[in-house]
């Protein structure tokens, strides 16, 4: 039995899906199948062909194909879901809930039919509730259904800190926990620049401003674009997760995980520090939180529960 390349299916060929497909192919993480609805099949094939023709120029070996037929996803090692309607200016994430939940259900049925042993990463907003929906619909073990938000939120936080200190983003580390909304919890105590705690480098009022900008980071881009939402940084975040899983890297990354008692929460998907590897979420890291941090996380968890309650 010869070795085969890994297979990655990306569901949704919009800006985020297409950018993710290209990024995972450029890293040679596996062959990529880009999937969209039948009405979008030709544009999806066109995008895939365009990317495939970049391969000889950039020197990466990965097949990229476009389709609307889920049979083409059969045997996927990893499936990334970006499908769904996007948030428009003035629209709350909650407005998206039921439309996108129905999309998640139909997509998940197809995925697990053709790839019963896959791992699924969800990006579609509101992501905590959509990941929960996919988990319940899929029947997969909890560690193999994972949501993306913490890497993106942490990346935004690190960007703003690096700007503030005029330092390399590589030297800034941090953790943003909780839901992917205005109640997310950037943990300043666990955030460093070159190993030095941020509280020693940045005055409190500037830190507070950075935290606030991080919380509204997605909305800031939505408003600037005027049509659509962020996709480069979200795609980069998905690619980091894909690499950690497909290469069994056991990276410490904030992801949206199913909690059964961790941090005191039950039956909820919430952003927490995890070890991400070949089995998906291999471990949930429970940090010691102050009363204030725990109260913030409680508020964030309540926001996620409120969205779940909107689900019909």
Curated annotation (Swiss-Prot):
It catalyses: (S)-malate + NAD(+) = oxaloacetate + NADH + H(+). The keyword Signal does not apply. The keyword Oxidoreductase applies. The active site is at residue 180. Keywords: NAD, Oxidoreductase, Phosphoprotein, Tricarboxylic acid cycle. It is an enzyme of class 1 (oxidoreductase). HAMAP family: Malate_dehydrog_3 (MF_00487). Belongs to the LDH/MDH superfamily. MDH type 3 family. This is Malate dehydrogenase. The gene is mdh.
């Amino acid at each position: 039995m010869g070795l085969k390349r890994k297979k990655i299916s990306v569901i949704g060929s919009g800006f985020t899906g297409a950018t993710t497909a290209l990024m995972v192919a450029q890293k040679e993480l596996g062959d990529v199948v880009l999937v969209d609805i039948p009405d979008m099949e030709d544009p999806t094939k066109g995008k895939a062909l365009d990317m495939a023709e970049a391969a000889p120029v950039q020197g990466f070996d990965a097949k990229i194909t476009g389709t609307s037929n889920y049979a083409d996803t059969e045997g996927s090692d990893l499936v990334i879901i970006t499908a769904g309607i996007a948030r428009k200016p003035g629209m709350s994430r909650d407005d998206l809930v039921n439309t996108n939940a129905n999309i998640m259900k139909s997509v998940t049925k197809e995925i697990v039919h053709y790839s019963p042993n896959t791992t699924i990463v969800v990006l579609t907003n509101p992501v905590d509730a959509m990941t929960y929906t996919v988990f319940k619909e899929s029947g997969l073990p909890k560690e193999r259904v994972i949501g993306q938000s913490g890497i993106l939120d942490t990346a935004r936080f690190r960007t703003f800190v690096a700007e503030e200190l005029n330092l390399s983003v590589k030297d800034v580390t941090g953790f943003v926990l909780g839901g992917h909304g205005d109640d997310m919890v950037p943990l300043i105590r666990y955030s460093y620049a070159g190993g030095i705690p941020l509280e020693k480098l940045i005055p409190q009022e500037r830190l507070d401003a950075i935290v606030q900008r991080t919380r509204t980071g997605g909305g800031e881009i939505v408003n600037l674009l005027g049509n659509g939402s962020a996709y480069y940084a979200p795609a980069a975040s998905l690619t980091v997760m894909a690499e950690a899983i497909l290469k069994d890297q056991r990276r410490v990354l904030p992801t949206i995980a199913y909690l059964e008692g961790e941090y005191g929460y039950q039956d909820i998907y919430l952003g927490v520090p995890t070890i991400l590897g070949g089995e998906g979420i291999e471990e949930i890291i429970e940090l010691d939180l102050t009363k204030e941090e725990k109260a913030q996380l409680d508020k964030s968890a309540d926001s996620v529960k409120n969205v779940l309650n909107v689900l019909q």
